[in-house]
Amino acid sequence: MAHWREEYAAALAARDRREKANVAIYNAYSQLADRTASSMIAVSDLQSDAQRSALSTPVADPRQQQPSPASGPSPQDIILAIRADLAEAQRSRSELEEQLARVTTELEKLRRRNIQNGKRISSMESEITHLQLRLKDRDEELREKAKLLEGFQDEIATFELQLNMAEERSNRLQKENQELIDRWMARMGKEADAMNDAYQFS
């Protein structure tokens, strides 16, 4: 009984852990989606600014152009950096989607398994109740048969005692009868001898 209850409790705990892990994945996915959207908006704005700057700036004479000191990254560099960041975010998003799909599939399997385990547990509990009732009936039947056997053994013991007593009485009577026969035969023999003697002397 305790074994399957421990397994069921462990399965429920594993389900709770997976659901909590899914919450973290959902949050990370939402943050990544927000970050991706912000990056795409920033790229679009920078591209528009770069195009307007290129159209409004007059073409200068190459001979009059002087090298200007570095004043920070150019819009093109920023665009490239944002695109790289966007690509990394997209890759991370794909990984999160795969992880989310895998965990969701495992969660569904676990839920189906829990449903099956619940049905199996219910069936086993019903079977256990049925077997307990049958076992109780068998115990009662065994007690009744034990009482019957005990009574029968008592009757056999009483009968054997009576039989032994009857055999002893029969043996005693047979012995007494034999003694009576022997005495009678002896007396008859003496009487016959006496009659023979009397006949001879008459």
Curated annotation (Swiss-Prot):
Cellular component per GO, a single term: phagophore assembly site membrane
Organism annotation: Emericella nidulans (strain FGSC A4 / ATCC 38163 / CBS 112.46 / NRRL 194 / M139)
Source species, domain of life: Eukaryota
Assembly, per entry: Homodimer. Part of the atg5-atg12/atg16 complex. Several units of each may be present in this complex.
Biased composition (Low complexity): 64-76
Coiled-coil ranges from the UniProt annotation: 78-186
Localization per record: Preautophagosomal structure membrane
Entry protein name: Autophagy protein 16
UniProt-listed GO biological process terms: autophagy; protein transport
Alphabetical keyword list: Autophagy, Coiled coil, Membrane, Protein transport, Transport
The family this protein is said to belong to: Belongs to the ATG16 family.
Function (record text): Stabilizes the atg5-atg12 conjugate which is necessary for autophagy. The atg5-atg12/atg16 complex is required for efficient promotion of ATG8-conjugation to phosphatidylethanolamine and ATG8 localization to the pre-autophagosomal structure (PAS). Also recruits ATG3 to the PAS. Involved in endoplasmic reticulum-specific autophagic process and is essential for the survival of cells subjected to severe ER stress.
Major site of localization recorded for this protein: membrane
Membrane topology annotation: Peripheral membrane protein
Region annotated Disordered, chain positions: 52-76
